[in-house]
Regions:
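Ser/Thr/Asn(+Pro)-rich, low-complexity disordered segments
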Residues: 17, 21-24, 145, 173-216, ...
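Amphipathic, well-ordered alpha-helical segments in soluble domains
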Residues: 87-88, 92, 115, 291-294, ...
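Substrate-binding groove/exosite segments of carbohydrate-active enzymes
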Residues: 222-347, 372-374, 379-382, 455-482, ...
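Terminal accessory carbohydrate-recognition/targeting modules of carbohydrate-active enzymes
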Residues: 30-245, 604-705
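Non-catalytic carbohydrate-binding regions of carbohydrate-active enzymes
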Residues: 408-450, 483-646, 653-656, 665-677
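The feature captures the catalytic groove of carbohydrate-active enzymes
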Residues: 180, 184-216, 309-314, 358-419, ...
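Secretory targeting and sorting signals
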Residues: 2-31
């Protein structure tokens, strides 16, 4: 999908006779008319549009789209600007408030990251905010995702104002609030509507049942507590850019809302389905973060997806990768052994880990021995990225074979890896020599001028750098990293950005037809930068670009976007068009993985790499970085802080003591270490090696960062 394709419930006990009644049709009692409270001095209007467009993708007229809902809901709710939202699950209806009139608006996640989206604007001297969120509500009739909505009107004037929220007729009132708002006062209008049934066919609840299930504040508190607890279970980050902290948290939450049961869908609209390589990338990131909730079912669901979907072969080849991360982090050898060489109930359509690795050998072609032609970047070709993905799959498979004690398969994987690496290197060397190239081409056999990468703004020029995984993630699993894919990383970044210098801002890689400004994978394209010398912080810089320039919902991004629309009512820089889905779970997975990898990454031998991708500006005096609850080998976790005071950078371990070596590899350390206390320095490489169990290291710099 790089171009043109594509509970912890608040239990409510209802004891009032009749309140547990349900109806079969959502158009009846579920959507009872809003209680009207007299005339309003405000003009009457329709809610801001939020509905499917000609291509079926749900969004607002300014390409605005995000999501609210609950973990594992069948169909998340699409949220748009101005407090409007679109409920799916057979209801297929837009809800919103006519009081919103497309005036200049801020649109944010409450608390910076929660899936409670707030639009704030001004009218008649009043500040009006509309907040929507989803909560998991258990009624006697079943489990539901219920949307709670508040229109808060604050009168900052010295005279009374009359403002009617003008709620959609089928929204259900939760309180009787006046339309008159006195000077300096705030009035809250609260509403509710059921939105999802977790894939069941349970009849929808009545208006009375929803009203009796509790008010806005109680459900907000439950929603907030749930997501805070979920975030506490994964690796936590704090960096000098708080926008990245919030994006990391919001990305995890959106992924859980986009998820439909055990199906790791890519979006709640547009791409509301599973795609093989998307699922692999999403799962790899969740395991890297330390989210193993339902891991067994998710791994087997991924098996079913890669085994039956013929669209993308690379998902099949890399199926071993999330398994390897899972085993490294959890030590759950029994689960891996049970699925290593044993197929699922449908034979090769539910392949074993071994099946997927051996498919790599079967898919190599011709005298060159490279991977065959695929449509993995949504255009048929002999793509460089495919060969590096296959190498990644083999590296992960070798690790798994060694861990389960299958010496024969480990030997086969090592031999196949060496053979494919040699073939890849020879073919690329020949292409580079024949056409006098100074970059890694996106095709194995042709220069970029001969294919879709001739368009400088087509981000596939950097496809190996995110989807290939190999140069960075392969190295983490002990793979040999040599050849053009290792040698030309910096040169290829320079080449690609050089072509974009006159057409696009810095730190965007371009997009896909016909929205070439940027993409949801923009941060992920910096992944191979972690294996480079000069672009180690590219992932973070490109993530910051996404936050500053291309949000299409609060901390939510389309797969591909056009340039910003200055006429949008949403204050800031936001794309005029988008395609795919927003939020986009695979894009967020790549962004959050490169952020976390830039701060902390673990090798399969237990070595912890710290700070390899952090910008030098983050180590200026007075700044600090922390990582907590980072998952390491066999179920352990570690944490640390990095703090700079003057020319001194201090690393301190928090939580469990480290059990393996720690490598402090901050870019600012390269040729800039004066003295180290608590570790051994390689000044030229800029690496400080810390022995296991050490809890404090001090590095004195020669020059300021």
């Amino acid at each position: 999908m790089r171009g043109e394709r594509r509970r912890r419930a608040l239990v409510v006990v209802l004891v009032v006779l009749g309140l547990v009644a349900v109806v079969a049709s959502p158009a009846a009692a579920l959507h009872a008319p809003t209680h009207r409270r007299g005339p309003s001095a405000s003009r009457s209007g329709r809610p801001y549009p939020c509905a499917p467009g000609p291509d079926g993708t749900i969004q607002g007229p300014n390409a605005d789209a995000s999501a609210i809902g609950w973990e594992g809901n069948a169909q998340g709710v699409v949220a748009c600007l101005g407090g409007s939202f679109y409920v799916q699950d057979g209801i297929d209806t837009t809800y919103g408030y006519g009081v919103y009139d497309d005036t200049k608006t801020t649109w944010t996640n409450v608390g910076g990251y929660l899936p409670a989206l707030r639009s704030t604007f001004h009218r008649a001297g009043a500040e009006i905010s509309i907040t929507n969120f989803g909560d998991d509500v258990q009624l006697a009739s079943g489990a539901f995702v219920v949307v709670y909505s508040r229109v808060a009107i604050h009168n900052a004037t010295s005279h009374a104002v009359m403002i009617d929220p003008q709620a959609s007729p089928r929204l259900i009132s939760l309180n009787l609030a006046p339309l008159r708002v006195g000077p300096g006062a705030t009035v809250d209008h609260d509403y509710v509507v059921a939105a999802d049934r977790f894939g069941q066919t349970t009849p929808w609840p009545t208006a009375g049942a929803l009203q009796a299930a509790g008010g806005y504040d109680a459900h907000f508190a439950h929603m907030q507590a749930f997501w805070v607890a979920q975030l506490a279970s994964i690796a936590q980050v704090r960096v000098p850019d708080p926008g990245l902290d919030d994006a990391y948290r919001a990305g995890f939450i959106y992924t859980q809302i986009v998820r439909s049961g055990d199906h790791l869908d890519t979006g709640v609209n547009g791409y509301a389905s599973e795609y093989s390589h998307d699922v692999i990338g999403i799962l790899a990131n969740l395991f890297t973060q330390g989210d193993f909730n339902g891991a067994h079912d998710l791994l087997l669901e991924a098996r079913d997806v890669v085994g039956t979907q013929g669209q993308y072969l690379d998902g099949y080849w890399t199926y071993s990768w999330p398994w390897a991360i899972y085993l490294l982090k959890t030590g759950d050898l029994a689960l891996v052994q049970a699925n290593f060489s044993t197929e699922g109930p449908d034979g090769t359509s539910t392949p074993s880990i071994e099946d997927t690795a051996h498919r790599i050998a079967a898919d190599r072609v011709g005298a060159t021995g490279i991977m065959g032609r695929t449509d993995d970047i949504d255009t048929l070709g002999s793509w460089t990225v495919d060969n590096y993905e296959a190498l990644m799959g083999l590296a992960a498979y070798r690790y798994l074979a060694e861990r389960v004690g299958d010496a024969s398969e480990a030997s086969w994987a090592a031999s196949e890896y060496d053979s494919l690496l040699a073939a890849t290197t020879a073919t690329l060397d020949a292409t580079i020599h024949r056409y006098h190239l100074r970059y890694l081409p996106c095709s194995m056999t042709d220069p970029n001028d001969f294919n879709r990468c001739s368009n400088a703004e087509d981000a596939n020029w950097a496809a190996p750098f995110v989807f290939g995984r190999w140069a960075w993630d392969g190295a983490l699993f002990g793979a040999t990293i040599t050849g053009p894919g290792a040698d030309l990383i910096d040169a290829t970044y320079d080449y690609g950005f050089g072509r974009l210098k006159t057409t696009l801002p810095a730190n965007t890689f371009g997009g896909y037809p016909d929205d070439y400004y940027s993409s949801g994978y923009n941060a992920g394209y910096g992944s191979w930068g972690l294996a480079s010398a000069a672009h180690r912080d590219q992932g973070i810089r490109s993530y910051e670009f996404m936050i500053q320039r291309t949000q299409s919902g609060p901390l939510s991004w389309w797969e591909s976007v056009s340039a910003p629309n200055p006429a949008s009512p949403w204050i800031g820089s936001h794309p005029a068009r988008g395609q795919g889905s927003s939020p986009h779970a695979w894009g967020m997975a790549n962004a959050n993985k490169v952020l976390l990898d830039s701060l902390a990454a673990e090798r399969s031998d237990g070595t912890l790499i710290v700070g390899r991708g952090i910008p030098s500006s983050w180590t200026r005096s007075g700044r600090s970085i922390s990582v907590a609850n980072f998952p390491t080998t066999d179920g352990h976790t570690v944490g640390f802080t990095l703090a700079t005071h003057g020319l001194t950078v201090s690393w301190s371990s928090i939580g469990e003591p480290t059990t393996g070596p720690v490598l402090l590899e901050l870019p600012t350390f390269v040729n800039n270490i004066r003295h180290v206390t608590g570790g051994a320095a390689d000044r030229r490489a800029g690496t400080v090696t810390v022995a296991p169990g050490t809890d404090h290291v001090v590095v004195e710099l020669a020059h300021p960062a």
